[in-house]
Structure formats: structure tokens, C-alpha cells
């Protein structure tokens, strides 16, 4: 797999469009940090660790729906392995004029765009969620 973050985001997007209650993904610290931000912002209901049949750690994400519509309307990967995009805290673009969030990988860990501006920390723009 060349881009595990895109795989995780695609699993979330596909599961929400298929109206599934939850989805699983191989576990990593980065995926767990992304899930923590999505939960804090109200885009997913919950996440927890699990194991698959082979005994490997997985991340089980419970999706959230509002009036039977997915809470995640859109989810796009911005920085890819072939084209990394870095922004200073002043240059981080707003998603839908502030209605969505950007997840940024900084030297202080993953943060949403508003936290980056508040803490004056730039970094790699991972994805946009709305």
C-alpha cells in the first residue's frame, strides 16, 4: 500500500456512503490521531482498537449519521506521497469558508486548522473534511 492515509480516508468515505454502522482499518498512530480529531469535531461517533482474524491490531470506527444522512459530507486527501503540500499557519486555506476542517501534521502532532492558526504552527496539510 503506497498511501495508508488515503486508504483510511477512502474506507471512511465509502462506509459512510454505504450507510454502514462502522468500518475497520489497520491500526497506526497516525490513523488513530486522525480518528481522534474527527471524533472531537463530531464527524464520527467513536473509535476503538480491535483485532482481526489474523490477530493484527485494527482501528474500528463507528460512523455518525444526522437525520439518516452521513455526518461526513466530503473528505479529500490534499497532500499525497507524490506531492507533499506544506503551509505556514497563515497560508492554511479555510474549508468551505470555515464550515469544514483541515487536518494538518505539525511538529507538535496532528491539529485541525484553527488550532494551527492559534498555536502559530504550520505543517503538511493531510486532508479536508466537511
Curated annotation (Swiss-Prot):
One of its GO terms (cellular component) is ribonucleoprotein complex. GO terms for biological process: translation. One of the primary rRNA binding proteins, it binds directly to 16S rRNA central domain where it helps coordinate assembly of the platform of the 30S subunit. Part of the 30S ribosomal subunit. Contacts proteins S5 and S12. NCBIfam families: PRK00136.1 (NF001109). The lineage of its organism: Bacteria, Pseudomonadati, Verrucomicrobiota, Opitutia, Opitutales. Belongs to the universal ribosomal protein uS8 family. The keyword Calcium does not apply. Pfam families: Ribosomal_S8. GO terms for molecular function: rRNA binding; structural constituent of ribosome. The gene is rpsH. This is Small ribosomal subunit protein uS8.
